[in-house]
C-alpha cells in the first residue's frame, strides 16, 4: 500500500471510530427559545364565564407569572362577537405576530398566517399544534382523546381562520361572561376529528357551565400566546 493510500485509510478509520472529529468545533449549542405559547393547566373554574377577554387574559398572565414567564404580555386566543356598541374581535388579531414556542423550545407556528393556514402551502402543512407539541405552562402534557379524562376541548369561539362568525348566533357564551346559558365554539388541541383546522374550531359546547364543558371532553382550558 502506498503512503498516500495508507494515509487515506487511516483517516477513514479515524472518522469511523470518532465521528465527532468530523464535526466543526467551536459551534456553541443555541439555547432553546423561551416559552411564548401554552395551554392553561386549569380553567378559571366557572365554565365559560371567564370575566370577558380581560379576565381570560389575566388568567393567562397569572399562570405565566407562576411559571417564571411573566416578563411577557399574554393574551388568550379568544374571539368575541359584536354586542351593543362594541365590534367583534377576531382571535387571530389579539395574539401578536409570532413566532411562538412551546415550553420545550419547539416552534408551534412562525406567524399568524402560518398558525391559520392562510396560504395553500401553509394549509397543507398545518401548524405544529398537536398532542405531541402542546404543553401547559408547567411543561406538562394535557389529556387528550383516549386519555381519562379527555380534556382536549379548548375554548376559542372562533372560525378555523381565526375570525368571527357572521350568523348572529352565540358562539362565545355571551362574550365569555356566561357560565350557564349559551354555547361556545371549541377547538381540539390534539386535532382529533377534523384535521389541520380542528385545533381552533372543532364543535360547539353543550352549554356554558363547567359541567357542560366537561361533558364534551373539556375543562374550560385556554390557548395562551405571548404578544411580545
Where are the predicted features?
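Bacterial N-terminal signal peptides
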Residues: 10-19
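Bacterial N-terminal signal peptides that target proteins for export
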Residues: 1-10
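Secreted/extracellular ectodomain signature
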Residues: 23-228
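A composition/secondary-structure signal for short, hydrophobic, low-basic-content segments
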Residues: 1, 19-21
